[in-house]
Amino acid sequence: MALAFDKVVLFGDSITQLAYDQGCGFCFGPAMQNAYCRKFDVIQRGFGGYNSDHAATIIKRLVEQETTIVFFGTNDSIVPESANHVPLARYKDNLRQIVATVEQAGAKVVLVGPGPFNHHQFVAANGKDFFCDRTTLRARAYCDAAMEVGAELKVPTVPLWYLVMEELGWKEGDAIYGLAELPADNPLNEYLSDGVHYLGKAYKVEFTNVIKAIKEFYPELDPDRIPEKLPAWDAITSLDALDEAIA
């Protein structure tokens, strides 16, 4: 009989797909694996370019117990002229469908709302002739929508737009880093690689707050409370006892 581990699924777009890229510095994926090492398997299911329409379509084939971290909205929030845009109302409906599918499978869910966007960094990475189809205010609106769905369905939500901005010292009423009309030299340059995708500082904000949400809302899934699989090496009394521990 195989040694079975429960699973945490990281389900999202390119920000999740890149969450194991060691070039980013601190990485969300390996940090989650380390937190659940020898306790749960952490499965990466990141799909670059996907939006919540795509996610709602494929979630039924991806969900596994015990926990699914759902992070979509970055691509949904692009301007309506772009093919990947998903209107706010449909985005919220898609999140409701995803949460329902996860919960019907007997798993817990944590929603993650999109983080901020940095206009000048995006233009520098893609060239001035590249159509800039995003704004940080649109990203904020979709983060708000994710928070609204989480509150409605009573599932935890990690509002990355606010969490990253607050870590930069921003507060409501301040000028918003990342806007086209503000200087290119701003603190988001240390959190984003190209105006959209994350560097280690942003992934650390995500990790810290996902774990915080799990501890608060699903204490039974707190990695600090879950025992490791199999006895410690110096507690093994015999190979037969070890074999029995797997059964």
Residue ranges and their predicted role:
Residues 1-48, 52-66, 171, 219-223, ...:
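Serine-esterase "nucleophile elbow" of acetyl-processing enzymes
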Residues 10, 70, 111-112:
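Structural beta-sheet core signal
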Residues 44-46, 113, 159-162:
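Residue-level recognition of beta-strand->loop/alpha-helix junctions
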Residues 77-89, 129-135:
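Surface-exposed cleft-lining segments at the edges of enzyme active sites
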Residues 119-162, 200:
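Substrate-gating cap/lid alpha-helix
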